[in-house]
Amino acid sequence: MSLSRTTQLPFAKRQFFQVLARNYSNTQDADLVVIGGGPGGYVAAIKAAQLGMKTVCVEKNATLGGTCLNVGCIPSKALLNNSHYLHMAQHDFAARGIDCTASLNLPKMMEAKSNSVKQLTGGIKQLFKANKVGHVEGFATIVGPNTVQAKKNDGSVETINARNILIASGSEVTPFPGITIDEKQIVSSTGALSLGQVPKKMVVIGAGVIGLELGSVWQRLGAEVTAVEFLGHVGGMGIDGEVSKNFQRSLTKQGFKFLLNTKVMGASQNGSTITVEVEGAKDGKKQTLECDTLLVSVGRRPYTEGLGLSNVQIDLDNRGRVPVNERFQTKVPSIFAIGDVIEGPMLAHKAEDEGILCVEGIAGGPVHIDYNCVPSVVYTHPEVAWVGKAEEQLKQEGVAYKIGKFPFVANSRAKTNNDQEGFVKVLADKQTDRMLGVHIIGPNAGEMIAEATLAMEYGASAEDVARVCHPHPTLSEAFREANLAAYCGKAINNV
């Protein structure tokens, strides 16, 4: 019997402690110490405790949840959701027969965001308590293969001896050379989530996921937003080219401005005015942009500073990541790493999966993850989501594929919701019909992509999904119709 997600805990505990008795002494203070209380770390800590390990989580910040819950996924979604409601009230309600006057109360919107964050971070604390996970607030440094020291705010140091150490320290904002972030006028994603007033003009460096989401928030609230992107498309790496073009067109209609194939040369500040110097990446054409808020969103980098990796001779790769094997194990057998500090997309759900799998592996179970089945979502309006390969990747790999598409304008639920922009696109192997990638732009794309992810995880064909009964009327029918088009060349409800 192997340890899996369906294994009963008594067996898991029994097998785990048999492994410990064979390989370790019993003098340590913990079975596992987790460095970092973000999505990967806190989930791993809880899972480890559920498997019977005495677990301690060390987090440097006062609240648990990491970047995602405190200054990332959660607060940004709160602002995206509420700014969308305001935009609908001002620009969409009248067409629905709703007459009203809506205005922005920014302090109240920020308070609602903060309340969401507070409830969720507090919830993790309760989960730790319920699962008997130890929590130490302090900065963790690895001083040996089985020892972590946590320096607390009062200057005291707590030493934790552990059979295993799991690094889940996350990532930090990548700085832009020559531009100093003050989180007031020149801001990172952190500052952009807490601006005290709506900018008149905002320039966003980077038209990836973070830049587009936060730019959308402030554009809806009244700012004139221009995104400067070095690449020739919006949406970052991995997005399907056709989807990206439609995405840019949609955001442009909303008032978003874009300068693509353009690099930022520098920025200077004079009082409340920021001057941004840009240059065409292809033609070398120079121009200047003026704004009162500059958002730097050029990505994130692994956070490993001060972890003490050199104390255990762990070297980083050329991108600052911790090298691990297929069991998330470093070159030191007792030290593991997951999430943003290792290779792969910097996504909270990817870190969560790795955390669960890693501790199951420590307990003697199997470890497997298919990174081709890790979905990505951009929570703008319309939403954009994808999983698997894009057309460009399949062409580059020389894979013969077929396409099935279905527009939301032909979907009954999208019609009744008066939210019918976008489409579902399915890429399937031309010979076997196996789904290779799914790309959605449109309403609730982030929710719909879960079905596609499940189908791909189980190796489904387009025909498999096309033959599954979907409830009517729902947006999910568009996914079925796209698979029908991929499988037999034609959807039912589209000419």
Swiss-Prot record:
Q: Which UniProt keywords apply?
A: Disulfide bond, FAD, Fatty acid biosynthesis, Fatty acid metabolism, Flavoprotein, Lipid biosynthesis, Lipid metabolism, Mitochondrion, NAD, Oxidoreductase, Redox-active center, Transit peptide
A Pfam family annotated for this chain is Pyr_redox_dim
Q: Does the keyword Transit peptide apply?
A: yes
Any one of the GO BP annotations? 2-oxoglutarate metabolic process
- Reaction catalysed? N(6)-[(R)-dihydrolipoyl]-L-lysyl-[protein] + NAD(+) = N(6)-[(R)-lipoyl]-L-lysyl-[protein] + NADH + H(+)
Enumerate the subcellular locations listed in this protein's record, separating them with semicolons. Mitochondrion matrix
Tell me the residue numbers annotated for binding NAD(+). 206-213, 229, 264, 299
- UniProt-listed Enzyme Commission number(s): 1.8.1.4
- What is any one of the record's Gene Ontology cellular component terms? mitochondrial matrix
What residues bind FAD, as annotated?
59-68, 77, 169-171, 340, 346-349
Q: Which cysteines are joined by disulfide bonds?
A: 68-73
The record, for PROSITE patterns, names: PYRIDINE_REDOX_1
Cofactor(s) this protein cannot do without: FAD
Q: How is the cofactor bound?
A: Binds 1 FAD per subunit.
Q: Which GO terms describe its molecular function?
A: dihydrolipoyl dehydrogenase (NADH) activity; flavin adenine dinucleotide binding
The catalytic residues are: 472 (proton acceptor)
Q: Other comments?
A: The active site is a redox-active disulfide bond.
The entry sums up its family as follows:
Belongs to the class-I pyridine nucleotide-disulfide oxidoreductase family.
Its protein name is: Dihydrolipoyl dehydrogenase, mitochondrial
Q: What species is given as this protein's source?
A: Caenorhabditis elegans
Taxonomic path: Eukaryota, Metazoa, Ecdysozoa, Nematoda, Chromadorea
UniProt gene name: dld-1
